[in-house]
C-alpha cells in the first residue's frame, strides 16, 4: 500500500490514506506507534489496542459503524486498516456548512442513534461519542469510529472510571470522579 496522511497525528497514532496496489482500492490505516509510549506503557497500549480491535470485530457489519478491514502487527507498530471515509469528520462537516437543515439533521441523527443502538445491543458502551469520532462517507452516511475507550459490559455492570473527551463528558461520568457514593454509569453516557 502507498500512504498519504489524512488526519493530524494523535498522541501515539497517525491515520494515513493507503491504496492497495493490486486493486487500486483506497483505505485508511491507523498506525499505532508502540514505541511512542513511556517505558512500561507500551504493554498497556498494546493491550488497549487489542481490546479496541476485539470490540471493532464485535460491531462489524453495521452500516453506520466503521468497518475494520485488516490488522497487522510488528514489534513497534500496529496497523488497523479501515474503510476510507472521504468526507472526514462530522465536526469538520458541521463547521464547513455552518447551518444544517432539519431534514439533513434528522438524517444524520437517525444514523447515529441506529449505530449507537447496535453498539448497545452488543453490551458495549463507547464512552467517547463526539462529532470528531463520527466520520462521513461519500453519501454523507455516518460511520461511528474510535472505540479506544469502549468497554464490553457484563449484565448489570456499572463503570466508575473517568474517560472520554473533557468537553463531551456525560454528567454521570463526572459524578463518578467527584463523589465517592456515585452510582456509576453504563450505556446512558453515550446518549
Describe every region a protein language model picked out.
Residues 32-60:
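Conserved N-lobe beta3->alphaC-helix segment of eukaryotic protein kinase catalytic domains
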Residues 91-100:
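AlphaC helix of the protein kinase catalytic domain
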Residues 66, 75-83, 91-92:
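A conserved loop-to-beta-strand element in the N-lobe of protein kinase catalytic cores
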Residues 114-124:
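Protein kinase catalytic-loop region centered on the HRD/HxD motif
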Residues 70-71:
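A short, aromatic-enriched beta-strand patch in the conserved N-lobe beta-sheet
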Residues 14-36:
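Glycine-rich ATP phosphate-binding loop
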Residues 108-109:
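Activation segment signature within eukaryotic-like protein kinase domains
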Amino acid at each position: 500500500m502507498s500512504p498519504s496522511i489524512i488526519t493530524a497525528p494523535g498522541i501515539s497514532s497517525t491515520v494515513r490514506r493507503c491504496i492497495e496496489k493490486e486493486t487500486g482500492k483506497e483505505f485508511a490505516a491507523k498506525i499505532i506507534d508502540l514505541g511512542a509510549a513511556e517505558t512500561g506503557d507500551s504493554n498497556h497500549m498494546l493491550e488497549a489496542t487489542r481490546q479496541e480491535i476485539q470490540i471493532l470485530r464485535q460491531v462489524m457489519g453495521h452500516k453506520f459503524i466503521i468497518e475494520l478491514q485488516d490488522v497487522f502487527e510488528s514489534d513497534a507498530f500496529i496497523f488497523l486498516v479501515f474503510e476510507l471515509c472521504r468526507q472526514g469528520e462530522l465536526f469538520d462537516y458541521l463547521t464547513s456548512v455552518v447551518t444544517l437543515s432539519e431534514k439533513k439533521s434528522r438524517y444524520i441523527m437517525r444514523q447515529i442513534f441506529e449505530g449507537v443502538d447496535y453498539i448497545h445491543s452488543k453490551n458495549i458502551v463507547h464512552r467517547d461519542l463526539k462529532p470528531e469520532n463520527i466520520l462521513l462517507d461519500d453519501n454523507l452516511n455516518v460511520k461511528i469510529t474510535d472505540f479506544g475507550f469502549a468497554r464490553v459490559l457484563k449484565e448489570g455492570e456499572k463503570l466508575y472510571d473517568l474517560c472520554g473527551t473533557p468537553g463531551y463528558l456525560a454528567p454521570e461520568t463526572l459524578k463518578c470522579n467527584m463523589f465517592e457514593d456515585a452510582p456509576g454509569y453504563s450505556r446512558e453516557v453515550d446518549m
